[in-house]
């Protein structure tokens, strides 16, 4: 029961879309209505408002980290086990992808996944973030960087921690993140994908 309750709480935390919240507070258009239509930091950046994009990035990452950290810190006292912690990691990510508070129209989960990985193991999170930064720096495609980082994240985890329930959760997160980027993959292949910092009319 503890596993399910903590997973449900994590899903609700993940369901808070900071792209939508920040945009409303800062008087920007709904991120679903412009650019890629994705409620995430990269799309918010297309408005030209860097502060809004930064707040979105921090918020989405923080909720992923917070859900897993709180569960790992306080969960065991209430019966949360390793399987439950893996469920929490996956649930907060699913909340971002399919948020109950925003008609299940969520983002692609890059920042939230990063927060989850940092909470699981800071070195794991930093290694995955470093992978993203390297690809983004050289190729200037946020989506490509996310895809490569997603591929390496489960590999990094297994090398550091071995195969367990959390490894399964990280693998599922990676697969879902890649699946959410299917349109970006098509655009990358056709040369139509937007580069980092490129503005679009909103």
UniProtKB/Swiss-Prot annotation:
The keyword Transmembrane is annotated on this UniProt entry: yes
Subcellular location: Cell inner membrane
BP-aspect Gene Ontology terms: phospholipid biosynthetic process
Protein origin, superkingdom: Bacteria
Main location: membrane
NCBIfam families in alphabetical order: glycerol-3-phosphate 1-O-acyltransferase PlsY (TIGR00023)
Subunit structure of this chain's protein: Probably interacts with PlsX.
Protein name per Swiss-Prot or TrEMBL: Glycerol-3-phosphate acyltransferase
Organism this protein belongs to: Cupriavidus pinatubonensis (strain JMP 134 / LMG 1197) (Cupriavidus necator (strain JMP 134))
Top-level taxonomy: Bacteria, Pseudomonadati, Pseudomonadota, Betaproteobacteria, Burkholderiales
Gene that produces this protein: plsY
